[in-house]
Amino acid sequence: MEKKLHLLILDDEPIVGKRLGPALSKMGVEVEVFEDPHQALKRIGEKTFDIVVTDIRMEDIDGIEVLEKVKAKSDHTKVIMITGYATVEVAREALGKGAFDFIAKPFKPNDLREVVHRAAEALGFKGLSRVEASRE
């Protein structure tokens, strides 16, 4: 039996998780979605995720702090940063602190699926579904 990829999505905009959760589940990935960074960090403390997708700008805790906490717990976890406020400086900081990739909003679910697929391959996961949604 093949090991399932475990992925956490953290974005304080509810629509993001509602769109991305099902899109990534179609790939055969086990997805947990959070809007509250405190709850997400608690869950990250309880379970090691293979991939974490986090927004950078959130209230209370920013995505860079989430990135640092994830990497401190498990260096193998691939962290994908998403933001509507993309700048070269923010991208450089995130990548410099160990982010796997950086995606600027707005993006299509297929864009994220492609990055997740690359992250999964980097972790040694094979056979993820490359589902392409026709209207995304």
Residue ranges and their predicted role:
Residues 89, 107-117:
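C-terminal output helix
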Residues 42, 64-76, 93:
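Short amphipathic alpha-helix used as the core "switch/output" element in two-component signaling
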Residues 18-26:
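Charged docking surfaces used in two-component/phosphorelay signaling
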Residues 58:
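Receiver (REC) domain active-site loop signature in two-component systems and cognate sites
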Residues 55:
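Active-site residues of response regulator receiver
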Residues 35-36, 62-65, 83-86:
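Acidic catalytic/metal-coordinating carboxylates
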Residues 28-35, 43:
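Short hydrophobic/Thr-rich beta-strand motif most characteristic of the beta2 strand and flanking loop
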